[in-house]
């Protein structure tokens, strides 16, 4: 049944030329336009009166509702839907997505005529009518962004705030937050120091990176409060936003706050600046040296350290804590043995203050640097001094317990492990084992929803709309509707929703929803760890001589078993294979007639994916951790991380100190999944920690992958 459903979905994908964008693990992606093969929608929508187009008239008469919906979605994406008098008329009133058509039309009208009171009234009426539906949240959010400039120019910000207050999910949407900041900064004669610092801390946060409205806030704030400019410059440099940083630098130079020639040289050519002034660093302007030090961290960290040392006694507490925290952080993620020394120079408040771009990452990488060299006493101290919410995270709860055992306080360790031992996660399993408990969860007394509960939850309009979106390949919209539909559900209702999703072959929703329930009820193992495509996976895993449980564990993480998945970086299919990798695999397998679109075929994708896993094992010491890391980040990186080890490393320590957050989480999830799938096959392991094994930096790895 599952294979048939996926095949039907795949055919739908081809029919509508769907190209999915976004992270399938997080189930998010950018919005995209779709067209129906039977008409040239792009050409039709260029017409000032597309509704009179003969080809379109014929299409709208013959097409089914899903085809028409995809056309009007493209019209909306191209900002052309307002050219239709009443697009709703082309659909039956029972079409589940008809309100999206109406919302798009109203929003498009508001964009064309923001001062039209009738449109504003229609939108308000629509929002009242659909107050419990996600479409109202979406329209309200988009309407705010469409009208923000108009309301700001006419000083009608009370209307903006009134609409914003009614949002449930999106009050803190970066665009909305920054529009509010921009209005307040632009319309205040005097900006208090506290308000300026608060605004600066908001726009400097990573989630606001690259936001156009937030850039307007930055310019307005610097214009009103020039003293914020250098802080903003330092943050932008650390975030790698060089073009924006250069604009701020130019403002500082124009306002005579920095010497023009030296600061431009330090910013644009830091290596040249260092060569020019390395023998007279102490004579250079303090702020110019700070610019050079931050810019050099990504070019030559030793040169950056020398510049930082030249500033001893010149920096205030905030400047010192941020600069040495940055050096420690960059050193730690690059596995530099001096990282802890650099952190130490930042003092007790290292990584804190307005100049620190990534305070959370900075703090955690100090702990990872201690973990990497097994300085257990230091690690225990660092975790004990983390912010409480950070110290309670699964990884630090586990390593706090381990550190206490290693420094002779084993009796204190269980209190930390018990906080996470009920979880099916990587660290939940390690904590269970450390407590002497099984890291498997018995399914002898599992809880299931009743048929009545499943049928009842399936009548939820949001879940119905979500399913329709999934059926036509619109996963972003489907995920939003699904999350909206389950947002207020209790554990029993979530279980019913998960089983309803499973019943309708929405395995991605079944898994994600079941995860929310797993801590409350013992669930059927297959609900959390389904095994679709068994024949194909068994066949190609055996052919590649790899463990099919590993393949399932990886596929569950990569695509949640969505056959037509495409990530935001272009990885495709069940096993998320990059186009260049697919070509390389085809060449290795001597497939001369390979075409890129074949990677979406279930058999081809699994064949290629398992073959590639075999090649990674061949190259990377036949080590499951390294091969899994290599599948996500590339074999060259995995090999470099291995070879940079100062000594043989415990597998769990190696994984925790992988520099890339995505890869670190990926490896943990895939390996935890793998032993869960093995459990289904009665292939239990007695020790997760021993199963993870060790990573030997001196192990032989070949320089070329072969299948």
What are these regions (language model features)?
Residues 83-89, 116-128, 155-167, 191-203, ...:
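Alpha-helical repeat scaffolds
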């Amino acid at each position: 049944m599952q294979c048939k459903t996926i095949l039907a979905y795949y055919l739908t994908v081809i029919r509508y030329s769907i190209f999915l964008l976004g992270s399938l693990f997080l189930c998010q992606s950018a919005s995209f336009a779709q067209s129906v093969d039977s008409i040239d929608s792009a050409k039709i929508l260029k017409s000032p009166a597309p509704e009179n187009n003969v080809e379109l008239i014929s299409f709208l008469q013959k097409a089914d509702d899903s085809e028409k919906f995809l056309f009007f979605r493209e019209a909306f994406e191209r900002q052309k839907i307002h050219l239709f008098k009443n697009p709703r008329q082309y659909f039956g009133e029972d079409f589940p997505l008809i309100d999206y058509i109406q919302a798009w039309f109203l929003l498009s009208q508001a964009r064309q005529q923001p001062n039209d009171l009738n449109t504003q009234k229609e939108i308000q009426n629509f929002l009242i009518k659909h107050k419990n539906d996600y479409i109202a949240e979406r329209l309200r959010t988009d309407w705010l962004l469409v009208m923000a400039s108009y309301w700001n120019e006419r000083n009608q910000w009370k209307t903006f705030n009134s609409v914003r207050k009614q949002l449930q999910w999106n009050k803190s949407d970066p665009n909305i937050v920054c529009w509010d900041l921009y209005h307040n900064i632009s319309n205040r004669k005097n900006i208090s120091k506290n308000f300026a610092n608060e605004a600066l801390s908001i726009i400097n946060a990573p989630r606001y990176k690259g936001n156009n409205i937030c850039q307007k806030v930055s310019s307005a704030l610097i214009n009103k409060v020039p003293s914020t400019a250098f802080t903003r410059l330092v943050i932008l440099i650390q975030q790698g936003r060089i073009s924006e940083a250069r604009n701020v630098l130019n403002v500082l130079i124009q306002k005579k706050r920095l010497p023009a020639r030296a600061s431009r040289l330090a910013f644009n050519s830091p290596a040249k600046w260092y060569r020019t002034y390395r023998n007279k660093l102490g004579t250079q302007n303090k702020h110019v040296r700070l610019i050079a030090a931050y810019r050099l961290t990504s070019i030559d960290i030793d040169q950056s350290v020398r510049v930082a040392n030249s500033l001893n006694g010149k920096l205030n507490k905030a400047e010192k804590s941020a600069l040495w925290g940055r050096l420690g952080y960059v050193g730690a993620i690059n596995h530099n043995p001096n990282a802890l020394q650099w952190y130490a120079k930042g003092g007790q408040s290292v990584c804190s203050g307005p100049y620190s771009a990534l305070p959370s990452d900075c703090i955690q990488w100090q702990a990872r640097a201690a973990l990497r060299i097994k300085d257990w006493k230091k690690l225990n101290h660092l975790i004990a001094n983390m912010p409480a919410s950070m110290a309670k995270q699964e990884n630090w709860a586990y390593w706090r317990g381990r550190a206490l055992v290693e420094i002779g306080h084993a009796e204190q360790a269980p209190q930390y492990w018990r906080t996470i031992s009920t979880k099916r996660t990587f660290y939940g399993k390690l904590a269970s084992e450390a407590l002497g408990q099984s890291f498997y969860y018995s399914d002898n007394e599992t809880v299931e929803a009743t048929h009545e509960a499943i049928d009842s939850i399936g009548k939820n309009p949001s879940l119905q709309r979500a399913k329709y979106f999934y059926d036509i390949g619109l996963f972003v919209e489907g995920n939003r509707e699904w999350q909206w539909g389950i947002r207020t559900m209790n554990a029993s209702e979530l279980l019913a929703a998960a089983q309803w999703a499973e019943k309708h072959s929405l395995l991605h929703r079944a898994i994600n929803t079941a995860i929310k329930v797993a801590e409350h009820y013992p669930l059927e193992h297959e609900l959390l760890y389904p095994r679709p495509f068994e024949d194909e996976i068994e066949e190609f895993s055996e052919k590649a001589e790899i463990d099919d449980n590993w393949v399932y564990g990886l596929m569950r993480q990569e695509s949640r078993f969505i056959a037509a998945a495409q990530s935001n970086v272009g990885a495709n299919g069940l096993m998320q294979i990059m186009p260049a990798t697919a070509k390389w695999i085809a060449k290795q397998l001597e497939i001369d007639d390979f075409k890129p679109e074949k990677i979406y075929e279930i058999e081809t994708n699994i064949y290629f994916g398992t073959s590639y896993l075999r090649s990674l094992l061949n190259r990377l010491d036949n080590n499951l951790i390294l091969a899994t890391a290599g599948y996500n980040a590339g074999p060259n990186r995995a090999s470099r991380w291995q070879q940079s080890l100062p000594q043989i490393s415990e597998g769990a320590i190696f994984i925790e100190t992988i520099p890339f957050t995505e890869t670190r989480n990926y490896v943990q999830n895939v390996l935890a999944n793998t032993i869960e799938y093995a459990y289904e096959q009665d292939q239990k392991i007695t020790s997760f920690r021993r199963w993870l094994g060790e990573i030997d930096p001196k192990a032989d790895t070949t320089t070329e992958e072969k299948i």
